[in-house]
Regions:
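Glycine-rich ATP phosphate-binding loop
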Residues: 1-24
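Catalytic-loop of the protein kinase fold
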Residues: 109, 113-128
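Activation segment/activation loop of eukaryotic-type protein kinase catalytic domains
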Residues: 122-162, 166
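Conserved catalytic-loop aspartate of Hanks-type protein kinases
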Residues: 178
């Protein structure tokens, strides 16, 4: 995805560059592209969705064209510890980002006669505009639930969708699959990590972010997993009110990433709790 000028108007262009004759997903790519266009068109009016301007299927690689806000960038860039341009994401910013993405998922799950599962929510699918508003994009792996069904098989089995342990083993996705991947996104906002799998110096190897967080909680090392960059502009988080907000946020993220789908909350509850947390923050 990159920015260009189209008739003197700045736009973002995303090419489906994996479409080649020898591509392992060549047979399913057309379906993915059409799905992306259709679903994005249905939700493009939402504040937290990257606005679709159009598409072109006549290029060597099909392209999606989006509205481009100056100074917008990927969420991973804003979270990166290498970010030294002063654009730090505060605790309030991160709550707002989480709330915005939760609202989009809730809309997908509840606004259509056939609920839509986003299917591939990762931190790389989120951009942040110049006002700090999160913009979700890439609905190519979204899938509607069949009438009367609560689950559906992921036809693109070669893609690992972060939907939770059960989905990974069976290729079955549900609305709770989105809840799981959203919980992982919450953990990344909380810790400041830009990859769901990180290198752990203590273990001397790579570790999944959920396991990393749980291990530190068990060892009573809460301070070591909180991204201190959230508070550089306000000082530390010793305020009991702020600490409670952090604990509530972390608790919700862990509930979303429960092993059993039945133990995860619905997106309506997740979005409601996040809105309440966001309103309780007194500073940005």
């Amino acid at each position: 995805m990159f920015a260009v000028n189209l008739k003197e108007r700045p736009v973002l262009v995303k090419f489906y560059s994996g479409l080649t004759k020898n591509s392992s997903w060549n047979e399913t790519a057309p379906d993915r592209i059409i799905r992306d266009i259709v679903v994005t068109s249905q939700v493009s009016h939402l504040k937290n969705v990257l606005q679709l301007i159009g598409c072109c299927l006549e290029f060597a690689y099909p392209a999606m064209v989006y509205y481009y806000a100056p100074e917008s960038e990927f969420l991973t860039n804003r979270l990166s510890h290498l970010n030294n341009d002063g654009k730090l994401l505060s605790w309030k910013n991160r709550l707002t980002i989480a709330t915005g993405i939760a609202n989009v998922l809730l809309y997908l799950h509840s606004a259509f006669s056939a609920p839509i599962i986003f299917g591939n929510l990762t931190i790389n699918k989120v951009r942040i505009d110049q006002c700090g508003v999160a913009k979700l994009f890439d609905f190519g792996l979204s899938i509607s639930l069949p009438p009367g069904k609560s689950e559906v098989e992921n036809q693109l089995k070669w893609i690992h969708v972060p939907s939770g342990p059960q989905g990974f083993k069976s290729n079955i996705v549900t609305l709770k699959s989105d809840v799981y991947s959203f919980g992982v996104l919450m953990l990344m906002l909380f810790t400041g990590e830009t990859d769901a799998i990180k290198y752990d110096e203590e273990m001397g190897g790579r570790i999944y972010i959920l396991d990393y967080v749980k291990r530190h909680i068990l060892n009573n090392q809460f301070n070591q997993i909180v991204d201190q960059n959230m508070f550089k502009q306000q000082g530390n988080y010793n305020d009991p009110e702020v600490e409670q907000q952090l604990l509530d946020f972390l608790d919700l993220a862990l509930r979303c990433t429960e092993h059993d789908r039945a133990d995860r909350p619905d997106m309506i509850e997740v979005a409601k709790l996040l809105r309440q947390m966001e309103k309780s923050v007194r500073y940005s």
